[in-house]
Amino acid sequence: MSYPNNKENSNNIGGGSFSVPSKQPQRVLQQQNTNINNHQTTSTVKSTITKPTTTGATTSTNTSTIPPTTTASSSSSSSSSSSSSSSSSSSSSSSSSQSVPKKKWCIDDFDIGKLLGMGRFGHVYLAREKKSQFIVALKVLFKNQLQTHNIEHQLRREIEIQSHLRHPNILRLFGYFYDDKRVFLIIEFAKGGECFKELQKVGSFNEQTAATYTLQIADALRYCHSKHVIHRDIKPENLLIGVGGEIKIADFGWSVHAPNTKRSTFCGTLEYLPPEVIEKKGYDQTADVWSLGILIFEFLVGRSPFTSDEEKNIFHNIQENDVYYPSSISPEAKDLISRLLVSDPHQRITLKDVINHPWIKKHAHPKSLEPTKLGLPLPSQMTY
């Protein structure tokens, strides 16, 4: 569930409310790089929230995936006094490297602000962690809805995957907790709101905006694929815009970690599905590459290339793969899209080649991969 900018006032879910400042607090807090496979990234996103070490009564029994800032306790005094100095050093090093227990969160740790958006299974609120004053979005999911639609396993997978991803163009999932009726996800606040809402406002994006977003998404997907993660639902509704105008891939509800095997699950959004998915032939990471081609087309035209009022016609259009390119699409953009929308998944352009494509090189913002230096206005605020 993504969230738009919503001006409605919220019904407080945890007591207290506040107004978001014009800028994110200039606060850099400690974090640990507990990435998948312990991979070190070059992400410039340094701000995170950290649980204070003080204890108190909570109504939650679950633990957060947010790395604590406390360090492990010093080596035990029960070590043998007869050990050699090298042995003592080794013991101390081993003890100090022990993992610190994860901290527990509850709703009382947050000031709850306005309602940002509503989805099928819950709501998203602006929130502020009381100790650090860090601004986040709090996604509140209702257990009865999750159980009714049998998607508890999907939520667990989403948490497991998204909480381990570290990339400036992937929305951070800092942690989670729950009570008797609700599950709370602590996620990064993307001030620009939904990409889809911006696309609706302006009809279509100019080439600089489209190329910049495409470059950022391609780089983020390349990172995901290096971790054997397939998103499986890339579309404007699942993209958010950060404070610097950068795109953020969100909603990993359909994502899967698939190191060695092809997938066969029919999932995602119909107009974005590649032929191998609808024909149930099995698919891999190249399914995301096809979806990127659909996305670029929609960025530039305002609709997907295979859209239809009839579901059966969408199936037919995807299988035929006969794309009509309006004259407004430049030759370079058409070339890139046509290289992505190839029916044979093995013949599609790679994400590395997308990043280095002439259309990207010509139109993408020079600071596209440096979000802290980007400063790109929202499409609806641009002067054309």
From Swiss-Prot:
Reaction catalysis annotation: L-seryl-[protein] + ATP = O-phospho-L-seryl-[protein] + ADP + H(+); L-threonyl-[protein] + ATP = O-phospho-L-threonyl-[protein] + ADP + H(+)
GO terms for biological process, alphabetical: centrosome localization; mitotic cell cycle; mitotic spindle organization; regulation of cytokinesis
Cited InterPro entries: Aur-like (IPR030616), Kinase-like_dom_sf (IPR011009), Prot_kinase_dom (IPR000719), Protein_kinase_ATP_BS (IPR017441), Ser/Thr_kinase_AS (IPR008271)
Active site per database record: 233
Residue numbers spanned by region Disordered: 1-100
Biased composition (Low complexity): 30-99
Molecular function terms, GO-annotated: ATP binding; protein kinase activity; protein serine kinase activity; protein serine/threonine kinase activity
Gene Ontology cellular component list: cell projection; centrosome; chromosome passenger complex; cleavage furrow; cytoplasm; kinetochore; nuclear envelope; nucleolus
Keywords, ordered alphabetically: ATP-binding, Cell cycle, Cell projection, Centromere, Chromosome, Cytoplasm, Cytoskeleton, Kinase, Nucleotide-binding, Serine/threonine-protein kinase, Transferase
Compartments where found: Cytoplasm; Chromosome, Centromere; Cytoplasm, Cytoskeleton, Spindle pole; Cleavage furrow
Enzyme Commission (EC) number: 2.7.11.1
Pfam families: Pkinase
Amino-acid positions noted as binding ATP in the UniProt annotation, renumbered to this chain: 116-124, 139
Biased composition (Polar residues): 1-12, 19-29
Record-annotated Protein kinase domain positions: 110-360
First-level EC class: transferase
Protein role: Part of a chromosomal passenger complex.
Complexes and interactors: Interacts with icpA. Forms a complex at the central spindle.
Family: Belongs to the protein kinase superfamily. Ser/Thr protein kinase family. Aurora subfamily.
UniProt xrefs under PANTHER family: SERINE/THREONINE-PROTEIN KINASE IAL-RELATED (PTHR24350)
Protein name per the record: Aurora kinase
Originating species: Dictyostelium discoideum
UniProt gene name: aurK
